[in-house]
């Protein structure tokens, strides 16, 4: 299987998000990379489903809460930017203050 660097990145984010979901199910608080991966995966999959950029920007801020991440992680993440493929092309989606 020949994957482009971008496809490899998307696969890595997806896998990290799967790990994060399993940890949340066990009650384990997420670290920085896991939180970023989970939010990023939500945006990428939402774009794939045809959701609007504005909708993903808003909904992306409700994927995880402060109670689900380790102490200090919410303060470290001010914005999450994800390049996602929508039905009409690739767009940059920014989720502001994603952990509330």
Swiss-Prot record:
This is Urease subunit gamma. Keywords: Cytoplasm, Hydrolase. The lineage of its organism: Bacteria, Pseudomonadati, Pseudomonadota, Alphaproteobacteria, Hyphomicrobiales. Pfam families: Urease_gamma (PF00547). One of its GO terms (cellular component) is cytoplasm. Heterotrimer of UreA (gamma), UreB (beta) and UreC (alpha) subunits. Three heterotrimers associate to form the active enzyme. Its main location: cytoplasm. One of its GO terms (molecular function) is nickel cation binding. It is found in: Cytoplasm. It comes from the Bacteria. Signal peptide: none annotated. Its EC number is 3.5.1.5. GO terms for biological process: urea catabolic process. Pathway: Nitrogen metabolism; urea degradation; CO(2) and NH(3) from urea (urease route): step 1/1. Belongs to the urease gamma subunit family. It comes from Allorhizobium ampelinum (strain ATCC BAA-846 / DSM 112012 / S4) (Agrobacterium vitis (strain S4)). It catalyses: urea + 2 H2O + H(+) = hydrogencarbonate + 2 NH4(+). Gene3D superfamilies: Urease, gamma-like subunit.
């Amino acid at each position: 299987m020949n994957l482009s660097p971008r496809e490899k990145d998307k696969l890595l984010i997806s896998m990290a998000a799967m790990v994060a979901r399993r940890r949340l199910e066990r009650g384990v608080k997420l670290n920085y990379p896991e939180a970023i991966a989970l939010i990023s995966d939500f945006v990428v999959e939402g774009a794939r489903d045809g959701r609007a950029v504005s909708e993903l920007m808003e909904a992306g801020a409700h994927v995880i809460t402060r109670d689900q991440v380790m102490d200090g992680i919410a303060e470290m993440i001010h914005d999450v930017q994800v390049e996602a493929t929508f039905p009409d092309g690739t767009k940059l989606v920014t989720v502001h203050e994603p952990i509330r």
